[in-house]
Amino acid sequence: MILSIKSVVVFCFIIFTIALFSAAISSCTLNSDKEIVNDSIPEVPWYGWNKYQIKPEDSLVRLGHDLIANTSYYFGPHGTIATITNGMNCQNCHVQAGIIPWGNNFSAVVMSYPSLSSRSGKMQSIAQRINGCFERSLNGKAIDSSSREMQAIIAYMHWIGDDVPHNRKPLGSGIMKLPYLNRAADPARGKIVFMNVCQRCHGKDGEGQLNANASGYTYPPLWGEYSYNTGAGFYRISNVAGYVKNNMPFDEATYLHPKISDEEAWDVAAFIDSQPRPEFNVKNDYPDISKKPIDNPFGPYTDSFSEQQHKYGPFKPIEEAIKKLRKN
């Protein structure tokens, strides 16, 4: 029997399709007991659920969100529960209540705790970590770890991060680590960046802007009596730099569309952290001094570099020295 060219083409196409389909089935069968991963699909930065997705019956989660978004209403200078913080809200440092990529989000909190804290040298629970923020970033006092408010904050963090695998930080978690400069970050240059970019919201003296009913800050104070203290994570300029690069100005920047350069971010971070703020007793922090972050501004250190260089850089020589010490 003589086949037409068209018939031959159709027949070959059918055979090819069957073979391809069989290979796909075989591939799935071989991986039936494993998670099928397509390496050609790039990882997408983590975004958290927004408050409108909280179910009506999840009242504890809703309270947790409100405590993070409006902390000062409950615990600030005129707090309805207690007057134990500086008037800032958790949301002032954790963008949109901790749901934005590289916005100091809460994606990795649940999967990270309990864990050994380098800062305290002890195992730390989520509640203890939260209270650390109350004492340092909010320059206040710890709340009862068994209180409804603490349980609500933890419930919200579980709601945000329960889908994150244990010990696997998602892309976009926390704060982006910017490349080190080849020089020290410069507060004088940073002041110019602050005046051009930050001052319109945070005020010329970094005092911030209170909300309409003065129950908290719409734009938080960056230094001074009502800002974070010297024990806070933001008293390390790498954290401030990574945060402002991807999130500031608040109404303009995103990680996809930053408004300032890496260099400007480092310099404005140096300017902000060169300003006066409440002091925190850090003498018991990092009992193992080899665990101190490179930009922790308080000695002693395992290396010979000064507190000034540990605060502002340049950090590359410190990084190289630490690597050599660890090899020995």
Regions found by a protein language model. Name each.
Residues P77-A127, G208-P249:
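Gly/Gly-Pro-rich "capping" loops immediately C-terminal to redox-active cysteine motifs
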Residues C12-A23:
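Bacterial N-terminal signal peptides
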Residues I41-I81, D162-M195, Q209:
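Electrostatic cytochrome c docking/interface patches
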Residues L63, R129, C133-K169, L256-P287, ...:
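C-terminal capping alpha-helices of c-type cytochrome domains
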Residues M1-K6:
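N-terminal secretory signal peptides that target proteins for export/translocation
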Residues G64, G87-A97, I153, G190-Q209, ...:
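The canonical Cys-X-X-Cys-His
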